[in-house]
Amino acid sequence: MELLQERIRREGRVLPGNIVKVDGFLNHRVDTRLLEDIADEFAKYFDTSKITVVLTAEASGIALATICAQKYGVPMLFAKKAKSDNIESGLYQSEVFSYTYKKRVTLLVSQEWLNADDHVLIIDDFMANGFAVQGLVDIVNEAGAKLEGIGIAVEKGFQGGGDRFRASGIPYKALAVIEKADENGFVFREA
């Protein structure tokens, strides 16, 4: 998606440890018009008429997933990273390693809101190694739901997470795949 790549070129930064900082428009301060364009782009790739829920992980994927869900006319569900007192029923859970936070976290989804009748589109703002998305896939499988696809706004292609999903046969679309990121800027792979 050329518009997204241009925003990354113009406003993105690379921090030590290959951290790609796009928080000025994607995952801290959010450009909602850009997210609408991203949702429209995903709708060109995925059959949104089949989807019954959009799933993401807490926290920075929530804004994009919400706009996608609103456009597709379905609920948005996010996996929590901590159990709260307001979850009464059983939980689906998956333990994953967070690249950003450098620690293991447990993704939690209430069994009340995800079941075998659901057709799920996983949406996330960012993918590095793909562990968080794999945790969401595991939760979908545990629920017996049908995974319709995975949509990622920005993928760090040099970390291999997206390549694993492409090889898996799961419908997968990343809109901006960063092949290289350094002090000289960004190089994108054909998405």
Explain the meaning of each model-derived region.
Residues 63-72:
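Short Gly/Thr/Asp-enriched flexible loops that form oxyanion-binding sites at enzyme active sites
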Residues 2, 6-7, 18, 137-191:
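PRPP-dependent phosphoribosyltransferase catalytic core
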Residues 74-120, 186-189:
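Short, glycine/charge-rich flexible loops or terminal/linker lids adjacent to PRPP-binding catalytic cores
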Residues 46, 68-69, 140, 165:
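A generic structural signal for well-ordered alpha-helical segments
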